[in-house]
Amino acid sequence: MAADIFSKFKKDMEVKFAQEFGSNKQTGGDITDKTAKFLRLGPEQDPRKVEMIKAGKEIAEKRGIAFYNPMMHSGAPLGQRAITPYTISGTDIVCEPDDLHYVNNAAMQQMWDDIRRTCIVGLDMAHETLEKRLGKEVTPETINHYLEVLNHAMPGAAVVQEMMVETHPALVDDCYVKVFTGDDALADEIDKQFLIDINKEFSEEQAAQIKASIGKTSWQAIHIPTIVSRTTDGAQTSRWAAMQIGMSFISAYAMCAGEAAVADLSFAAKHAALVSMGEMLPARRARGPNEPGGLSFGHLSDIVQTSRVSEDPAKIALEVVGAGCMLYDQIWLGSYMSGGVGFTQYATAAYTDDILDNNTYYDVDYINDKYNGAATVGKDNKVKASLEVVKDIATESTLYGIETYEKFPTALEDHFGGSQRATVLAAAAGVACSLATGNANAGLSGWYLSMYLHKEAWGRLGFFGFDLQDQCGATNVLSYQGDEGLPDELRGPNYPNYAMNVGHQGGYAGIAQAAHSGRGDAFTVNPLLKVCFADDLLPFNFAEPRREFGRGAIREFVPAGERSLVIPAK
């Protein structure tokens, strides 16, 4: 496998630096060359830039105020260096750099939309209220009827109340509710259109793990309309869902809208039986639940679905790294906390051109050779986490990565920033340590050691302050203080020290995933999230985040939440 990935990495470098793209005149040369000319061809060398310049001029003329002009670049035109394409790692998709900015990429937007607009609400508490307080009978037939009512109401349609305005179905066609349960007997009675079938979506072993964790409980996987969460925020998801749940119970079970039991149903839907994707942030970051800063690394690992369709533990982790770098670096830190150009190329370093993949699969072979197959799927084959093991694997990984950059200067040109290289080197080391030990905090130790080795070798990591969290991170891997020493799976973008800067959080998420994909676990932290997103009806395919980003870049991805129906045709 490592040899195949190495060949693909070299092919990606050739596509990027030895073949002409647009009119950048990159034909010829070798990917190991140490020198090359900057031809200073300007932005017109790139097809997308030409399109953007044309659009910018037309818009400026139409609105009468200056707009996009790449000549406003510190007195020198954009495009002094060659503008080169990216290959999406793990795929053959080649795309324009600009098309990996999330504003230009509908798939990236939809990935976050699909997370933000989702919540999980338990059914059992509501059913107990109906049975014990109201004397209602709850059967598979009544549950199916309730779900039919709910799928009418959840997009914003009326029940119970007459003469209420409603949302147009064509604007909210991505909104629906399904249920799942660990009770096979109940699942058999649920109308299949409403069921996420654990036995169908997961392997036999994974399904057994998940059902053992969920037990006989039943849950609703709720996806409110994309257009709603875009207009409001992530905190609206549970409120929108709870309102429609309450009205649907009233309608389906012939309740009186004003009776006291409605308050219990509402409390269950809004609080007691609610599982949000992300936690509320403190006031200084002022974000409610279901916003990126509150999405833990373990939750993201469970949202990504690669573990359902692949038995390759390294690939499973790399897909989470890609998803995490896009969400945490490009959208969270790059816009929520910063803005504008954002931090796109911190993230692309981890999911393009197979540079991280090449390093990781080298590590897999190294671990399997030295530690008797410890990087293959299994629980009994793991090497015990220790400082010596972490030092060995992380050092080997980092030195290989550094040597690759030095042997292939094109990889250095690709990852032109020190912080990009630091992210990739440390992510490979951390994922490798996690795979070998089945211990995510050992993976964190590998990440931090990689940073120290990198700085020792090359004298610096990234921009000033990039390595703040890395300089103090090792001391907190096993701290007794809960806010410092959390397992990696429970940490997130708002964990102390992690909120400082880019180029880290996606790697931490991949490290969390690697510990569990290496063990063959069906989920990382929460089986409810793993099942909730095991659903082909979602617009974004969470089994292949990187490929979806590529489809968005080449304009093949079809998003939800569009307003074409209610605006003039162009």
Curated annotation (Swiss-Prot):
Protein's GO biological process: methanogenesis
1-thioglycine: residues bearing it: 465
Cofactor(s) the record lists: coenzyme F430
EC number: 2.8.4.1
Residues carrying S-methylcysteine: 472
Localization terms from the record: Cytoplasm
Keywords carried by this UniProt record: Cytoplasm, Metal-binding, Methanogenesis, Methylation, Nickel, Transferase
Main location (coarse class): cytoplasm
Annotated GO CC locations: cytoplasm
Pathway note: One-carbon metabolism; methyl-coenzyme M reduction; methane from methyl-coenzyme M: step 1/1
Modified residues ((Z)-2,3-didehydroaspartate): 470
SUPFAM superfamilies referenced in this protein's UniProt entry, alphabetically: Methyl-coenzyme M reductase alpha and beta chain C-terminal domain (SSF48081), Methyl-coenzyme M reductase subunits (SSF55088)
Free-text description of this protein's post-translational modifications in UniProt: The alpha subunit contains five modified amino acids near the active site region. Is methylated on His-271, Arg-285 and Cys-472, probably by the action of specific S-adenosylmethionine-dependent methyltransferases. Also contains a thioglycine at position 465, forming a thiopeptide bond. Contains a didehydroaspartate residue at position 470. The methylation on C5 of Arg-285 is a post-translational methylation not essential in vivo, but which plays a role for the stability and structural integrity of MCR. Does not show a methylation at Gln-420, as shown for M.marburgensis.
Gene Ontology MF term list: coenzyme-B sulfoethylthiotransferase activity; metal ion binding
Class in the EC hierarchy, top level: transferase
Cofactor binding description: Binds 2 coenzyme F430 non-covalently per MCR complex. Coenzyme F430 is a yellow nickel porphinoid. Methyl-coenzyme-M reductase is activated when the enzyme-bound coenzyme F430 is reduced to the Ni(I) oxidation state.
Function according to Swiss-Prot or TrEMBL: Component of the methyl-coenzyme M reductase (MCR) I that catalyzes the reductive cleavage of methyl-coenzyme M (CoM-S-CH3 or 2-(methylthio)ethanesulfonate) using coenzyme B (CoB or 7-mercaptoheptanoylthreonine phosphate) as reductant which results in the production of methane and the mixed heterodisulfide of CoB and CoM (CoM-S-S-CoB). This is the final step in methanogenesis.
Family, as annotated: Belongs to the methyl-coenzyme M reductase alpha subunit family.
Protein name: Methyl-coenzyme M reductase subunit alpha
Species annotation: Methanosarcina barkeri (strain Fusaro / DSM 804)
Gene expressing this chain: mcrA
